[in-house]
Design a protein with these regions (language model features):
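An anion-binding catalytic pocket shared by soluble metabolic enzymes
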Residues: 4, 11-130
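Active-site-proximal loop/helix of nucleotide/amide-processing enzymes and allied scaffolds
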Residues: 130-143
Length: 143
């Protein structure tokens, strides 16, 4: 299932991420494979997402993030370049779901691209924020 089909709002967000990645590349802010982009997608999730089979085994986050149970994120793929993400975001990143145990995530779309590893810092950094503050969260870090 292509997760962007029939979800114009989600597609617009992912295309915005691609545009930002293009700017990061052009400005030289993300060296080679450096830099992470993660966007919270939970508000764009549809009922069809919950039963979607995982494309990966559960992957350990490195800490427990109970406030993010069941949340969805788009994350740039590890070893993926910003310029390539700008051209084809779903081939250079993936949509992940935080598992019910809050200590693992699984890749659900569109391909099994291993995401960058900033989830523990994102989760710990926002643990004190009310969920309403998290309606759209974008994180970019340079290495």
């Amino acid at each position: 299932m292509e997760i962007l089909s029939n979800n114009a709002a989600l597609k617009a967000v992912i295309m915005d991420v691609a545009e930002v990645a293009g700017h990061i590349w052009v400005k030289g802010w993300g060296e080679r494979n450096g830099g992470n982009i993660t966007v919270r997608l939970t508000e764009f999730a549809t009922p069809e997402w919950a039963p979607m089979p995982a494309l990966s085994d559960p992957i350990a986050i490195g800490c427990e993030l109970p406030h993010l149970r069941g949340h969805y994120f788009y994350a740039k793929g590890t070893q993926k370049r910003m310029r390539d993400l700008a051209r084809d975001p779903m081939a250079n990143g993936s949509v992940i779901r935080i598992c019910d145990d809050c200590a693992h995530y699984e890749i659900i779309a569109d391909s099994a691209v291993m995401p960058t590893s900033e989830l523990p810092s994102i989760g710990l950094g926002i643990s004190q924020l009310p969920i309403s503050t998290l309606s759209l969260m974008i994180v970019f870090t340079c290495l």
